[in-house]
């Protein structure tokens, strides 16, 4: 399957730290992942070649459904050229120097996005992505195709029954572990103090709340509902709404976005509430992409390091 994509940087999008899911498995310039297409586990390989995304499924699935899934995950229907014009109008076109072609990387599984977003709180991208990969490997279903094994993300019912454990500060470097060591609880997957949050949120989503309701809700009501979940504060809720459900008004704020926004708007002294209100008013339905481009530019241009050192 060939999908015209225009300006799209597949690798940058995969590695931009969006909390929908870990980056897909890279193999010789292509990326592979297991998708569920009309109930069928289907590993796919995607490769970006000169404005065309080549999609190769490992099994026979309906092509229309597969195409729609890929277009959704990589937000290929979004008019990125229109967004570039918007950046120019807002005097933010400098972010294109390091971020051109970056798109949203949306969840293939909303529940995985919920857990990924909780796991990412106050945590490095490397650590939370490894944690999610461990959770998949331990409690997801294994699917092997052509000698390559992929794991689904476990259901809320499965994670509800997983032990929290007591290995909060486990060293994550596997070469420092005994050869017969095996992970058997959540904390040993590196989620630390978030383990009880993950279990309780899994229980709520298994027994009390249908996460699919979010799709049909407006942003404010959906955010209020998500804040009832264990381990979900304002930033995590906005990550779930953005990457899990593409609520474009969402503007996730963490310590780095806070510093970036105060850096580019000197004298405003934003707090989190005023920053979100400003972003929604100033950027409207482009707020999601503005946040994505601002953070990616700061990370790739060195601004993030300067802000960390207090020299920005």
Swiss-Prot record:
It comes from the Archaea. Residues 1-22 are annotated as: Disordered. Signal peptide: none annotated. The active site is at residue 235. InterPro entries: DNA_glycosylase (IPR011257), HhH-GPD_domain (IPR003265), HhH_base_excis_C (IPR023170), Ogg1 (IPR004577), OGG_N (IPR012904), Oxidative_DNA_repair_enzyme (IPR052054). Residues 13-22 have a biased composition (Polar residues). Keywords: DNA damage, DNA repair, Glycosidase, Hydrolase, Lyase, Multifunctional enzyme. CDD domains: ENDO3c (cd00056). One of its GO terms (biological process) is base-excision repair. Its EC number is 3.2.2.-, 4.2.99.18. PANTHER family: 8-OXOGUANINE DNA GLYCOSYLASE (PTHR10242), N-GLYCOSYLASE_DNA LYASE (PTHR10242:SF2). This is Probable N-glycosylase/DNA lyase.
């Amino acid at each position: 399957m060939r999908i015209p994509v225009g300006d799209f940087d597949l690798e940058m999008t995969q590695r931009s730290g969006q909390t929908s899911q870990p980056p897909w498995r890279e193999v010789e310039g292509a990326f592979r992942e297991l998708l569920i297409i009309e109930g069928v586990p289907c590993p796919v390989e995607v490769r970006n070649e000169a404005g065309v995304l080549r999609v190769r499924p490992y099994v026979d699935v309906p092509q229309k459904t597969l195409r729609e899934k890929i277009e959704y995950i990589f937000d290929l229907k979004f008019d990125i050229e229109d967004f570039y014009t918007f950046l120019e109008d807002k005097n933010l076109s400098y972010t294109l120097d390091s971020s051109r072609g970056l798109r949203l990387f949306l969840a293939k599984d909303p529940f995985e996005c919920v857990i990924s977003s909780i796991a990412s709180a106050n945590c490095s991208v490397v650590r939370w992505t490894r944690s999610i990969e461990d959770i998949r490997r331990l409690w997801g279903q294994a699917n092997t195709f052509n000698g390559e094994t992929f794991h689904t993300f476990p259901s809320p019912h499965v994670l509800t029954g997983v032990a929290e454990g007591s290995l909060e500060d486990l060293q994550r470097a596997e070469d420092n572990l005994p050869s017969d060591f095996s992970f058997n609880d959540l904390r040993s997957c590196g989620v630390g103090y978030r383990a009880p949050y993950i279990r309780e949120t899994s229980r709520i989503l298994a027994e009390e709340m249908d996460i699919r309701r979010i799709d049909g809700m407006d942003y404010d009501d959906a955010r209020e509902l998500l804040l009832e979940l264990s381990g979900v504060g304002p930033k995590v809720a906005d990550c779930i709404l953005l990457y899990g459900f593409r609520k474009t008004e969402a503007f996730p704020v963490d310590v780095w976005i806070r510093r970036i926004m105060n850096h580019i708007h000197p004298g405003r002294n934003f707090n989190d509430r005023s920053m979100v209100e400003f972003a929604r008013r100033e950027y409207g339905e482009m707020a999601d992409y503005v946040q994505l481009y601002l953070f990616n530019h700061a990370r790739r241009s060195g601004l993030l390091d300067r802000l960390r050192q207090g020299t920005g």
